[in-house]
Amino acid sequence: MPLQPFKTSNLLTMGVELELQLISLSNFDLTAASPDILELLGRSSFPGSFTPEITESMLEIATDVHEEYDQLLKQLFHIRDALVTVGDRLNIGICGGGTHPFQMWSDQRIFNKTRFIEVSELYGYLTKQFTIFGQHIHIGCEDGNQALFLLHSLNRYIPHFIALSASSPFVQSKDTLYNSARLNSVFAFPLSGRAPFVLNWDEFSLGYFEKMEHTGIVKSMKDFYWDLRPKPEFGTIEMRVCDSPLTVERAAALACYMQALCSYLLENKEPLPHEDDYLVYNYNRFQACRFGLDGTLVHPKTYEQILLREDILTTLRRLKPYANQLNSTMALEHIYEITHKGSDASFLREKYAEHRTLESVVNESLKQFRRSK
């Protein structure tokens, strides 16, 4: 069926989705608890929305649509508190983090939902390996053309979000040497990567999408695992590169960083996006995944080599007036702190060095989720 029209949204509104880990408190491994959690959540009023994810040791939550940082953070606190309460009743821990440090993918169970079963039949073992945990950020757009402009203008900032959110250094009991190992699992899927360079919504909808649908490869936008994708049914663009942070404060701060960036980009303060910008896209993405804030980027316009951490700090200075207008200065202060104190990946490595067991690392992640102010 044709791609639905792009819904008009209030510009720069935002929403957050978080994929969270469900932890057995007896051994700190993942546990297939989402059916029980979902049933219990469904019996009471929940301050947001919740859905199953591809395997039963995962849970996705989503906020409402918000305009400002304080509103978003307040709801995330309420959601966190509700999840912790339900988890305590079931003796299940809940935490962030882009990967679980030592779970084995072969132990995971596919959630009994038609779409998930179809995906599992198509992609085989990759589906269980997709037991990874990300944050998705939605930003409201007025029309499809604006959405595509922002989507491609943001491409040079994707490494910022990867490095700032990085929380997946460990996979199957090994330190991967990556700060965000999670994204390597996403890249295994054939429809991952980046969106085609199209700036006109009709051309995207009637040209690209209709052709892809005609091939039989895709049925909806859900079939694309792009780093950034338009969501016409919501009237948003959706960023999908972030690891799930260990705290809801960081989740809110990342959303507001994207909101302020979009506000800045809409004033045409930078050269227009171009297909050639993507010549360095995968390299820059790799640098952020592998080295985090210590990565080195190639600027897509000038080909100058720049330090990722310094590029974030320069961007924060540019965004200060936009954050003031959006009442999100506290959020950008949190981003600034990450550049100086380190990412969640650094925190997890520090805890492993301190305790020398990955079970202790998971326990520290559980504490971080509950400890949010």
From Swiss-Prot:
Q: What start and end residues bound the annotated signal peptide?
A: none
Q: Which InterPro entries match?
A: GCL_type2/YbdK_subfam, GCS2, Gln_synth/guanido_kin_cat_dom, YbdK
| E.C. numbers | 6.3.2.2
Q: Which reaction does it catalyse?
A: L-cysteine + L-glutamate + ATP = gamma-L-glutamyl-L-cysteine + ADP + phosphate + H(+)
Q: Does this UniProt record's set of keywords contain RNA-binding? A: no
Sorted alphabetically, the Gene Ontology BP terms of this entry are: modified amino acid biosynthetic process
Entry keyword Ligase? yes
Return one GO MF term: ATP binding
Q: Which NCBIfam families match?
A: gshA_cyan_rel (TIGR02050), PRK13516.1 (NF010040)
The UniProt function text for this chain reads: ATP-dependent carboxylate-amine ligase which exhibits weak glutamate--cysteine ligase activity.
Family indicated by similarity: Belongs to the glutamate--cysteine ligase type 2 family. YbdK subfamily.
Q: What is this protein called?
A: Putative glutamate--cysteine ligase 2-2
> Source taxonomy lineage?
Bacteria, Pseudomonadati, Pseudomonadota, Gammaproteobacteria, Legionellales
